Amino acid sequence: MKKITCGAKKKQPKIKTEMTGKGLTVHGGLLPVLNFMDKLYFFKAVETALHKQRGANAKYQFADAVQMIVIGVITGATAMTQVAAVWADDVLRRMAGYEKTPVDTSLGRIMKEASYRDVTAMEGLIHRFRTKVWKRAVRSGTYLKSAMSVMWLDVDSTVDGVFGKQEGAAKGYNPGKKGQESYHPLMGFVSETKEVLHSWFRTGSAYTSNGAVEFMKECLARIKKGVKVIVRADSGFFDGSLLDYLEATCSGYLIKVKLKNLNALLERQIWKAIDSKKLPGWEQAEFEYKCTTWSKSRKFIAVRQLIGIEQGLIELREYQSFCYVTTENLTPYAAHKKYGERATCETWIEECKTQMNAGHIRTSEFWANSALFQCAILAYNLLKWMALLTGGAVRQWEIKTMRLWLIRVAGKLTEGGRQLTLKLPRRFLHQEEWQLWERMSLTIF
């Protein structure tokens, strides 16, 4: 019998290892990130906004810790020890201009100096960076509806469970692990750019809509005058005081209804078929309704889908219903589809939590944890802004994809003629996207 050999696979060669390489890094893709942060005057902006000067003998300032944690989170760090491990990379330190970097305990000690004022300043920083990025995007020809006319703002909360005793953690709504202490952050996403407009780090006992009006006041203060904001949120934000505030500021809303008597209310409405051919079994209704605690009635829209018929003396039809309160001039079915786009908001929250590890790096103190949460939001937004300005396929990539194809690129730092050069592989996957990514990072704002 003739032996068939495969030409693709050859015998594995014997390879010895030597730990003698110099100037090597696995994070070559952080150079464009550092360049982008430099063009934003990131370090100076943090230093100026926080006005936080440590003692004269302190080697590292609060702004140093913020930058190191942001970079660490971008690489995928989920703990302070991992942030310190990332900065153990000699090449990264040289690229960022550091001779040495602090150990994890020193970073934690610096962050424990954070206060409510510092967290508020960090929230404001995100807004100032966004203003710069959006202006540059519009100048370069990117059409940003959110910067010019209408912004759909997706608001949601998320549960972040903790282990052990941590200040501010408390028992509250936690469907994943009932009874576990947690934090309950509140976040607002710009639907068009997928970035975080504003966020609060809250105790776990806070109800979903707790402080929603104050949160929206801070959100609207961060939006250009003349831009109409339409808030899209789940039933946790079905609150009369929030609707009153949004109407008073000429903002719109599309919010899922939460009522005890909702089914009975919907049964009393006049239902019309949407399209018997394209959408058989689907019906819609529109009506005015005033809740007990409201000062006035508002427009409700609803759709329902026939999911079963029970035959008997009386034919019983079973429906799956969806109901919303809104200010928008949309048909019930169009509003239902528009609300369905909000599902991506939950994806972004998950991306922010699991891929950017927002809320994962923690200390025992609440304001330190809140500042660390804002560092993760900064890291998330930085990559989203870089993707926005790079354009093309990169704009559609998730954080983990950017990290895999753009950040984790092997490199060797060499020096010659007083010039540092980062040498990358001659060929690697998504090389064209990486070159666009780097070119964008070198453009002055």
Question: Which positions does each model-derived feature cover?
Answer:
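Short amphipathic alpha-helical "interface-anchor" segments enriched in bulky aromatics
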Residues: 36, 83, 159, 277, ...
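Conserved nucleotidyltransferase catalytic core and NTase-mimicking acidic/glycine-rich helix/loop elements
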Residues: 73, 385-411
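An anionic, glycine-rich sequence signature occurring as long contiguous blocks
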Residues: 2-16, 252-356, 411, 441-445
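Dynamic "connector" segments at or just before major functional cores
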Residues: 1-207, 213-224, 246-249, 393, ...
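Acidic, metal-coordinating catalytic cores used for nucleic-acid/nucleotide bond scission
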Residues: 231-239, 259-261
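Catalytic cores of alpha/beta
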Residues: 240-244
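Short, solvent-exposed helix-loop connector elements
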Residues: 50-57, 332-339, 355-371, 387-398, ...
